[in-house]
C-alpha cells in the first residue's frame, strides 16, 4: 500500500465497534465535534467518523470533514497505537462563519487537530480494585 493509504484494518467498520466506543464518555468536545477514545489493546489504531446529514446537509461538506479526519489520523497514527478513535459532528457550521470553502476547511482542520492532539495523550487507567478493608470489631 502507498504511503497515504487508509487500509481497512485502520477503520472502525462494524456497528458493534462503533457502539463499544460510543458507550464511553466523550473525551473532549469542541464547538462542532465530539471525540471518543477507547483502548483496543495491542492492535493498531483505528478511526471512525460519524457525519450526519442533520449537521452537514451537503455531501461536499461531509466528504471534506471525512478527508480532514483521515489525513490528521494518518499523520498521528504512530502516536495513537492501541486506540480506537471516533469523531462525531455535533453541530452545524453557520454559513456566516464559513463564507468560503477555504474557511470551512481551515476551521475543520483546526478543531480536528486539537481533538487529535488530545487523543494522542496517554489514556487514564481505570481505577484499580482495592481489597475491602476490615472494619473495627469484625473478625476476618
UniProtKB/Swiss-Prot annotation:
A GO MF term: tRNA binding
SUPFAM superfamilies tied to this protein: Ribosomal protein S5 domain 2-like (SSF54211)
GO BP terms, alphabetized: tRNA 5'-leader removal
Catalytic activities: Endonucleolytic cleavage of RNA, removing 5'-extranucleotides from tRNA precursor
Keyword entries, A-Z: Endonuclease, Hydrolase, Nuclease, RNA-binding, tRNA processing
InterPro entries linked: Ribosomal_Su5_D2-typ_SF, Ribsml_uS5_D2-typ_fold_subgr, RNase_P
One of the Pfam families matching this protein, by short name: Ribonuclease_P
Any one Gene Ontology cellular component term annotated for this protein: ribonuclease P complex
EC numbers, comma separated: 3.1.26.5
Similarity remark: Belongs to the RnpA family.
Complexes and interactors: Consists of a catalytic RNA component (M1 or rnpB) and a protein subunit.
Described function: RNaseP catalyzes the removal of the 5'-leader sequence from pre-tRNA to produce the mature 5'-terminus. It can also cleave other RNA substrates such as 4.5S RNA. The protein component plays an auxiliary but essential role in vivo by binding to the 5'-leader sequence and broadening the substrate specificity of the ribozyme.
Protein name, per record: Ribonuclease P protein component
Gene that this polypeptide is encoded by: rnpA
